[in-house]
Amino acid sequence: MSQETRRVIEQYARSHDPQCFAEDAEFTQVALLNPIEGRDAIADMLRLFYQEAFSDARGDLRHVAADTGQDLGFIEFTFHGQHTGDLMGIPATGRTVDIAMLGVYEIRDGLIRRCRLYYDMATLLRQLGQLPAN
């Protein structure tokens, strides 16, 4: 893995700073299908997710890998947080979630150009009490 790719990905994983993204970046939560385009829109999404919907959110990084030939980085992590605000129309439940996630990042010129985030939406909804446990 190029050191620059690893540095950018790990910096973002620790900070969730929208400045890690290129101005014209694209962020896709694959479970939702609709990409978020542009750093400002990504910043709004990150604020909603990490400060409003899950005010104590954190990610426990498990693995970081990359394809050095294409400046692709991959992070496997577990997202933890207490649901304290509206998320996709679901009012705060106070429930704690623990969701396995995988992020795929395309890095260019020291910034994230594209992110695709994979996770199981049904697991998230179950943990929020929106789907039956089985």
Regions found by a protein language model. Name each.
Residues M1-N134:
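C-terminal and inter-domain tail/linker signature
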